[in-house]
């Protein structure tokens, strides 16, 4: 007999873009136990025609095969196109050199040989932070990364600016052999619109407000998985085509209990802060408003929607939740789409 799987699609209309988020690149893998992964992927592609095979294999937990499928897809795409690899849009990173192929939906990230003076970290520390994210619950808020060694590119597909910049910043990680450029170690992530560029170019106030709300939710949800994001400048976040804000800069992340959230001492002395004793793990949330977003109207919006982020008490409450080992369930979909939805019955908030 032929088995059938029924998907309820009533008056509320289940849409593919909402289903897509469940299998999204910012969520942890399902680790599906199936003898027929190819058939499962084929079924899911009928529901999600915009998802590539490698994305679905990875979402199901077949990570290594997903990497193989990605490389095949990448090679086929490069052979079928003629655009050039170029530096990715946005502010250049202090730790990574990031580039992309405009016609392809990923970015390539290479650890620089030397970091900016403000970054007191090592190459191994960066790798360790990326491994931490890989093994953590990403709750739909941290982009998945795919680590490759000796990844090959066609040399003639690099524009001059990118090739020069790679030689300047990542000489120890690249090798040129005849007509190929080999990168000894790199990470690949899904390409998103950097949040700072989105907020700069967007004119719709409602969309701007939604993005700022998403930014606050993103920070809070990551913290509830026992990870402190560290560098929370809005340039380190991206926004997807579905309007979700995702974090993608991991070199300064740490566990929540590794930080001491403090108040700024109240004083009439304008020089009091200059003499304040600060330990390396001290964090002052009251200062977050000065660097998460820059422009005043964006700061005001963030404080209105997520003002608790700027208080030490809130962060200490999150630390207590993490210490108790509580598991918080963040559904990636509106509760009205749940099979168990009962109108009028309060559910976990849609986050």
Roles of regions detected by a PLM:
Residues 1-202, 214, 224:
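Conserved ATP-binding subdomain of kinase catalytic cores across diverse folds
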Residues 36, 194-199, 255, 279, ...:
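Short, solvent-exposed coil/turn linker segments
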Residues 108, 117, 228-282:
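Catalytic activation segment of kinase domains across protein kinase-like and atypical kinase folds
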Residues 109, 284-324:
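C-terminal accessory extensions/subdomains outside the catalytic/core fold
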Residues 122-127, 140-143, 257-271, 329-335, ...:
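Short, surface-exposed, charge-dense and proline/glycine-enriched linear segments
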Residues 130-147, 265-296:
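Active-site-adjacent segment of 2-oxoglutarate/Fe(II) JmjC oxygenases
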Residues 204-235:
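Conserved kinase catalytic-core helix
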Residues 306-351:
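Long, compositionally biased intrinsically disordered regions
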């Amino acid at each position: 007999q032929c088995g059938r799987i029924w998907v309820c699609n009533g008056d509320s209309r289940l849409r593919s873009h909402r289903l897509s988020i469940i299998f999204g690149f910012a969520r942890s893998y399902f680790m599906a136990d199936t003898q027929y992964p190819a058939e499962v992927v084929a079924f899911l592609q009928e529901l999600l025609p915009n998802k590539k095979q490698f994305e679905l294999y990875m979402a199901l937990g077949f990570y290594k095969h997903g990497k193989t499928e990605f490389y095949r897809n990448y090679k086929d795409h490069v052979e079928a196109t003629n655009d050039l690899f170029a530096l990715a849009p946005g502010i250049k990173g202090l730790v990574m050199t990031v580039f992309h192929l405009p016609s392809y939906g990923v970015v390539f990230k290479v650890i620089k040989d030397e970091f900016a003076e403000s970054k007191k970290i090592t190459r191994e520390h960066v790798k360790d932070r990326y491994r931490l994210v890989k093994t953590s619950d990403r709750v739909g808020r941290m982009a998945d990364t795919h680590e490759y060694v000796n990844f090959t590119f066609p040399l003639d597909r690099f524009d001059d600016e990118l090739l020069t910049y790679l030689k300047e910043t990542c000489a120890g990680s690249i090798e040129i052999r005849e007509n190929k450029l080999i990168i000894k170690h790199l990470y690949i992530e899904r390409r998103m619109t950097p949040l700072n560029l989105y907020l700069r170019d967007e004119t719709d106030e409602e969309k701007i407000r939604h993005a700022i709300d998403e930014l606050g939710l993103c920070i809070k949800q990551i913290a509830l998985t026992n990870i402190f994001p560290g560098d929370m400048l809005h340039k380190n976040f991206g926004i997807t085509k579905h309007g979700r804000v995702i974090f993608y800069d991991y070199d300064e992340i740490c566990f929540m209990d590794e930080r001491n959230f403090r108040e700024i001492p109240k004083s009439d002395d304008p020089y009091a802060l200059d003499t304040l004793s600060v330990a390396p793990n001290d964090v002052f949330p009251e200062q977050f408003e000065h660097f998460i977003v820059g422009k005043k109207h964006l700061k005001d919006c963030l404080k209105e929607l997520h003002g608790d982020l700027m208080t030490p008490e809130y962060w200490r409450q999150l630390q207590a939740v993490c210490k108790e080992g509580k598991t918080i369930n963040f559904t990636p979909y509106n509760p009205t789409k749940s099979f168990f939805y009962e109108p009028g019955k309060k559910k976990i908030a849609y986050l």
